[in-house]
């Protein structure tokens, strides 16, 4: 599966792993390179072959694209669900205001990782899981989760097909895939609104 979700907290990762555990192939995230240095978790993500991205633009963007493609080639060999937090970062009111996002509870989407995954693996995906996570009692911190103070969590999952016209020919970029992902994300904005 190709999985996309909104992103508010580190807790989102725990929630997604819990919701999808043993229901779909293991989730693998496109992860910020800095997170490799987080004790235990960074090593685990490295050992599990999560792709680490620098996300700085320029030459780094080309290196990220190549790293992402290599990761997707490995994903083709082992059942994997490719996960993308489409906003590219955790939502905060300050980031929302700075971006002037057209969505009430979401940042503007960054769909490069989805386009890359569709370019490399499009024909292998069973479907697109459009996930919305809502914390009605307020967004918890990772410490809240560890202390058992998670509160209510609402997870909405919509299984969407990936239209054939969105998939690029092998080796070609996936601009239509990015547009499709943006459309799905816009619908999620309505759910959160």
Give the role of each language-model region.
Residues 2, 83, 129, 183-186:
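Conserved beta-strand elements of the Class I
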Residues 20, 71-75, 118-121, 182-189:
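Hydrophobic, Leu/Ile/Phe/Ala-enriched alpha-helical segments that form helix-helix packing faces
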Residues 168-193:
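Accessory terminal regions of nucleic-acid processing enzymes
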Residues 33-48, 76-169:
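A cross-family acyltransferase "interaction/gating" segment
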Residues 1-60:
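Catalytic core of membrane glycerolipid acyltransferases/transacylases, capturing the structured
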Residues 15, 67, 113-116:
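Well-ordered alpha-helical segments embedded in enzymatic catalytic cores
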């Amino acid at each position: 599966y190709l999985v996309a979700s909104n992103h508010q907290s580190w807790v989102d990762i725990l929630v997604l792993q819990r919701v999808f555990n043993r229901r779909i192939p293991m989730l693998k995230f496109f992860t910020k390179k800095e997170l490799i240095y987080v004790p235990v978790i960074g090593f685990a993500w490295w050992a599990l072959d999560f792709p680490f991205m620098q996300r700085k633009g320029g030459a780094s963007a080309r290196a990220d694209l190549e790293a992402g493609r290599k990761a997707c080639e490995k994903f083709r060999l082992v059942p994997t669900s490719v996960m993308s937090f489409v906003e590219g970062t955790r939502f905060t009111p300050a980031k929302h205001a700075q971006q002037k996002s057209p969505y009430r509870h979401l940042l503007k989407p960054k769909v490069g990782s989805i386009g890359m995954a569709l370019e490399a693996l499009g024909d292998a995906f069973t479907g697109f899981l459009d996930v919305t996570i809502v914390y009605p009692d307020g967004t918890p911190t990772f410490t809240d989760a560890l202390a058992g103070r998670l509160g209510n969590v609402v997870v909405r999952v919509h299984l969407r097909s990936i239209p054939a016209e969105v998939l690029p020919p092998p080796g070609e970029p996936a601009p239509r895939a990015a547009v499709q992902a943006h459309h799905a994300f816009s619908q999620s904005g309505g759910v959160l609104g």
